[in-house]
Every structure is written in structure tokens, then in C-alpha cells.
UniProtKB/Swiss-Prot annotation:
One of its GO terms (biological process) is translation. The gene is rpsG. GO terms for molecular function: rRNA binding; structural constituent of ribosome; tRNA binding. Part of the 30S ribosomal subunit. Contacts proteins S9 and S11. PANTHER family: RIBOSOMAL PROTEIN S7. Belongs to the universal ribosomal protein uS7 family. This is Small ribosomal subunit protein uS7. It holds the Pfam family Ribosomal_S7. One of the primary rRNA binding proteins, it binds directly to 16S rRNA where it nucleates assembly of the head domain of the 30S subunit. Is located at the subunit interface close to the decoding center, probably blocks exit of the E-site tRNA.
Length: 156
């Protein structure tokens, strides 16, 4: 148990365009070197592109896509008597969202489209269809947890 006081989580202000805390949080994941206006441009550009392609509400689309990428379980390394076991654990809700956002941004960055906004839009559209690198990452994590189910009694 830590002796220090537990720090309260900061409240994220909703984004100016859609008034969505989730999109504001996603912008923070996209942001590099504190350049929030650049991150805003990327995220809004990607959501506009998604809206053009699918003719749907971008916020609802983003929420639904994020839900498809969220992992339910993950593996954590646990040392028992000189051996390290990959122990499957359920992921808490806040971490689920954070991992999904991180995976989406990482997958988008590795794509080959010209701008980051186009890459992000492409990755969001792929994830909505159940394909793409972010979905593959989620499936890999779930597969690892399933493969190591035998060690689930080594809970933390």
C-alpha cells in the first residue's frame, strides 16, 4: 500500500466542436510535443473524412469503433518460483479505452496514406469493419490471454 495520498484523476474538458470527452481524450493521444491545435486538425480532419464516406454521425461512429477495439482481457507477467508466467487479467474500463485509443493511433501512424488525418480515417473505417491493425492487435492480446488461461489462478 502506498503511503502517499491517492491523486484524483484530472477531469478532461470536452472538445470544442462535438462537446465529447472521448474525442478530447483521443486528441490527447494523437497530440505530440504539446501541439494540441495540430492534433485537433488531425482528429477533426479524420472525422470529417469518415462522415463524407459513411454519412453517419462522426461521434457515434467513433464511439462504436472504439468499442470494437477495446480489449476485455490482457496478460501480465508474474514471477513464481523462478519462472515467469503470462497471467490473463481482466482490463479495467479506463485502461480499456486508453489501450484502444493508443492502438488506433499507433496503427494509423504505420499506414501509408499521405497525411495523418487520412491514415486515422482509414484506420477508423477499417476498425469499424472489423479489420485493420488495431483490431488485429486486440485479437492478438485476446489470443495470448486464451493461450495462457491455465495460469489464471496466479491472480495478483
Amino acid at each position: 500500500m502506498p503511503r502517499r495520498r491517492v491523486v484524483a484523476a484530472r477531469e478532461i474538458l470536452p472538445d470544442p466542436k462535438f462537446s465529447s470527452q472521448t474525442i478530447a481524450k483521443f486528441m490527447n493521444h494523437v497530440m505530440q510535443d504539446g501541439k494540441k491545435s495540430v492534433a485537433e486538425g488531425i482528429v477533426y480532419g479524420a472525422l470529417e473524412r469518415v462522415q463524407e464516406k459513411n454519412k453517419v454521425d462522426p461521434v457515434e461512429f467513433f464511439e462504436a469503433t472504439l468499442e470494437k477495439v477495446r480489449p476485455m482481457v490482457e496478460v501480465k507477467a508474474r514471477r513464481v518460483g523462478g519462472a515467469t508466467y503470462q497471467v490473463p487479467m481482466e482490463v479495467r474500463p479506463s485502461r480499456r479505452t486508453a489501450l484502444a485509443m493508443r492502438w488506433l493511433v499507433d496503427a494509423a501512424a504505420k499506414r501509408s496514406e499521405k497525411t495523418m488525418a487520412l491514415r486515422l480515417a482509414g484506420e477508423l473505417l477499417d476498425a469499424a469493419e472489423g479489420k485493420g491493425a488495431a483490431i488485429k492487435k486486440r485479437e492478438d492480446v485476446h489470443r495470448m490471454a486464451e493461450a495462457n488461461k491455465a495460469f489464471s489462478h496466479y491472480r495478483f
